[in-house]
Amino acid sequence: MTIYSNSPITIAILKLFQELENYILKNHKNLPHGAVKAFIFGGCAFHIHTNARGSNDIDAEIQAIQQLKKHDIVVFLENNDVEYLDDNNLETNLEFDRSFNTSLASVDPDYPERAIPLVANRIVEVYLVSGLDLAISKLARLSDRDIEDIKELYLNGKFSLEAFKKSANNAEMYYATPEQLHSNIQYLVSILSELRG
């Protein structure tokens, strides 16, 4: 499965999480690999999957062992933007979006099992959510851009229609307002069915 792990945005994301690991190692010893796990969602994940538009905000689910304070990790990420040169050689900033929360998104709880490791066997491990889980996470809001993103992921072979239905139904069971999500799922299933006709 093709991902774009050497693009300027991807390199900037990995730099931010390397800086987080350096910060953690200054204050803690003998931590296991995966003491912090970051799961990349949103526009950055869409970019890594498709090399299409990116985002200046990192949407990520952060998990941390009890020994570490998740709040301190989030504050560090929020206060440490990464400057980088984009594809047009323009200087831009990448910022961590503290407001992203998987409990507010439509997410299949099995997403970590399908995540693609970008950085493994380190204190801070970074994962890219699968194209399937990225598509599912866009179902709750379902803006015009979300619809286009889901279609592009599907047309790029990132998931099958059957996998989409199954995972969307899993997400629906855990979502706060399942009726609205159900309606969005049905709408997208009809759109995706027509695409592959």
PLM region spans:
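Compositionally biased terminal segments of proteins
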Residues: M1-I40, C44-G197
